[in-house]
UniProtKB/Swiss-Prot annotation:
Cellular component per GO, a single term: cytosolic large ribosomal subunit
Family in the record: Belongs to the bacterial ribosomal protein bL33 family.
Record's protein name: Large ribosomal subunit protein bL33A
A Pfam family this chain is assigned to: Ribosomal_L33
PANTHER family in UniProt: 54S RIBOSOMAL PROTEIN L39, MITOCHONDRIAL, LARGE RIBOSOMAL SUBUNIT PROTEIN BL33M
Source organism superkingdom: Bacteria
Cell division among keywords: no
Cited PROSITE patterns: RIBOSOMAL_L33 (PS00582)
Entry keywords, A to Z: Ribonucleoprotein, Ribosomal protein
Matches recorded under Gene3D superfamilies: Ribosomal protein L33
Gene Ontology MF annotations: structural constituent of ribosome
Length: 56
C-alpha cells in the first residue's frame, strides 16, 4: 500500500484569496497537475466567487 506522501492523488486544502480564511478540501492528480492548484469557487463569507489557491 502506498504511503501518504507518495500517493498519486493527495488531499489538498484550497484557501480563499479574499482573506476570509474559508477553505475547501479536494484531491488532485499529481501526474496531471504538478503545480499548485488554483480554482475559482464560491466564498460564502464575502458572497462572491474568488480564486482559491492550494496551500501546503
Amino acid at each position: 500500500m502506498a504511503s501518504k506522501s507518495t500517493e498519486l492523488r493527495p488531499i489538498v486544502k484550497l484557501k480563499s484569496t479574499a482573506g476570509t480564511g474559508y477553505t475547501y478540501v479536494t484531491r488532485k492528480n499529481r501526474r496531471n497537475d504538478p503545480d499548485r492548484m488554483v480554482l475559482r469557487k464560491y466564498d460564502p463569507v464575502v458572497r462572491k466567487h474568488v480564486d482559491f489557491r492550494e496551500e501546503r
